[in-house]
Amino acid sequence: MSFDIAKYPTLALVDSPQELRLLPKESLPKLCDELRRYLLDSVSRSSGHFASGLGTVELTVALHYVYNTPFDQLIWDVGHQAYPHKILTGRRDKIGTIRQKGGLHPFPWRGESEYDVLSVGHSSTSISAGIGIAVAAEKEGKNRRTVCVIGDGAITAGMAFEAMNHAGDIRPDMLVVLNDNEMSISENVGALNNHLAQLLSGKLYSSLREGGKKVFSGVPPIKELLKRTEEHIKGMVVPGTLFEELGFNYIGPVDGHDVLGLITTLKNMRDLKGPQFLHIMTKKGRGYEPAEKDPITFHAVPKFDPSSGCLPKSSGGLPSYSKIFGDWLCETAAKDSKLMAITPAMREGSGMVEFSRKFPDRYFDVAIAEQHAVTFAAGLAIGGYKPIVAIYSTFLQRAYDQVLHDVAIQKLPVLFAIDRAGIVGADGQTHQGAFDLSYLRCIPEMVIMTPSDENECRQMLYTGYHYNDGPSAVRYPRGNAVGVELTPLEKLPIGKGIVKRRGEKLAILNFGTLMPEAAKVAESLNATLVDMRFVKPLDEALILEMAASHEALITIEENAIMGGAGSGVNEVLMAHRKPVPVLNIGLPDFFIPQGTQEEMRAELGLDAAGMEAKIKAWLA
């Protein structure tokens, strides 16, 4: 989409923070209105994360207006809310390409812009990185400032509190901005807090506060009285006690949609020493009523008509694998009162909405706390229940020690339903499910299953749920199932694959949902096709049978080749001294960028044509 200067006359003057800082303050509310409309126009045409960015327009403008970015370093947590930041930092005309192959990255990305200080995608990393950056800036000695912006969801994670605890100890000069869009702010309380925030962040108050502490530092009763008086003044209107106890100077909450008020407060706080904490209240989806009413639905959107206020309805085609999981979960819970389901803030994405409504006493959303989710499941298992952890592949990485130490070593029957395994598409490097087979395969006592279709997925979930000798995992992809018939549930024999097609010379050992493409290749090359089903334990007898009756083996998986299922096949053959040529097909040794799943599979040679070409080139 070409930029319409007539439609956005103020935004047309701003293609960088330097140009932003040339504008008079009085024009900034108009700039915010235009920026919000441009974001709506752009994302509705291209798709992308939507509601979060609408809520951070004023904050983004205020931060770049007050701070000398990129010299001063601005760090965004997660990055869903950073679209306005991208628009104001030289990427305005490319915002329509965001999340597309070869387009702007969906999150702040160091390789894309000098204004993107930290590459992000996973939550709760900003404060830890910000402390390191602030310490480095202090040693540099050039008065470079550090600001971290974190949301009310991300700040609930343990890593954020670990970082704040450390900041309170070493006291770097930095600002943490909490973008809180969970609660509404009433006009009266908001006005009082805005006034108080500007007072408490001002130089006079700060000087009196620090000077008073120095004067009375040797008089404990008076020092304690001053501290309590300050706390009572703040406590009348602010909920910042926790952050003060962690060692931060807390200001807020303030109206995050008052751009001029934010600028005043940020200017006052800019030169304060030590860790500062600014709590702002915003509304997710601000300025677009449908998104304000339903920010979860409008969190990430496909292309849509903004005048309709509705997102396009699903075509009613095949169910997603997440839906297959959710249906199985409800079906099983209705029969077994011991079932408990856990998710780290992924209710909608993991297909658990219906379960949460039907079985609220057995549904646990632990927020963005993957480590806690896994060890909580371990505790439930110890207590005699049957926990299921529904989690994205990329987020399970954050709880690796808990899987190993708290579940596997104790042989606890926890079932991991691993969604978004393999290539996920538009969210790029930080969200691809490329590594779960590699990092789980080396854990003793773990059973790992890779369904080739939705019926296999149900059978494997059932098998894992009834496996009581240790943990199990079923990994399945983002996207729709393939349309096979669903058969009655029954336990699969652990560690056994099945031959789907008999051929000659070549045997293709497939792990997972690339099976339809693998079947095309097998047909074209007249190869034997095996659905291996289990990555751990591997069907060693079947592998050795295939090695004995074929000239070469091909392994196929949508996981990193290094350490993946194919590596396991290689290990079996070497352990039995079978010098059979093996070609491992899977994800290469680099972080997979954004693009649709179809685009990336084609580029990586994981569609039928690409696999066949790789095999023919290898055999030549």
From Swiss-Prot:
One of its GO terms (biological process) is thiamine biosynthetic process. GO terms for molecular function: 1-deoxy-D-xylulose-5-phosphate synthase activity; magnesium ion binding; thiamine pyrophosphate binding. Binds 1 Mg(2+) ion per subunit. Binds 1 thiamine pyrophosphate per subunit. InterPro entries: Dxylulose-5-P_synthase, THDP-binding, Transketo_C/PFOR_II, Transketolase-like_Pyr-bd, Transketolase_BS, Transketolase_C, Transketolase_CS. Thiamine diphosphate binds at residues 80, 121-123, 153-154, 181, 288, 370. Mg(2+) binds at residues 152, 181. It is an enzyme of class 2 (transferase). Its cofactor is Mg(2+); thiamine diphosphate. Keywords: Isoprene biosynthesis, Magnesium, Metal-binding, Thiamine biosynthesis, Thiamine pyrophosphate, Transferase. It holds the Pfam family Transketolase_C. Pathway: Metabolic intermediate biosynthesis; 1-deoxy-D-xylulose 5-phosphate biosynthesis; 1-deoxy-D-xylulose 5-phosphate from D-glyceraldehyde 3-phosphate and pyruvate: step 1/1. It catalyses: D-glyceraldehyde 3-phosphate + pyruvate + H(+) = 1-deoxy-D-xylulose 5-phosphate + CO2. GO terms for cellular component: cytosol. Its EC number is 2.2.1.7. Belongs to the transketolase family. DXPS subfamily. Catalyzes the acyloin condensation reaction between C atoms 2 and 3 of pyruvate and glyceraldehyde 3-phosphate to yield 1-deoxy-D-xylulose-5-phosphate (DXP). Homodimer. This is 1-deoxy-D-xylulose-5-phosphate synthase.
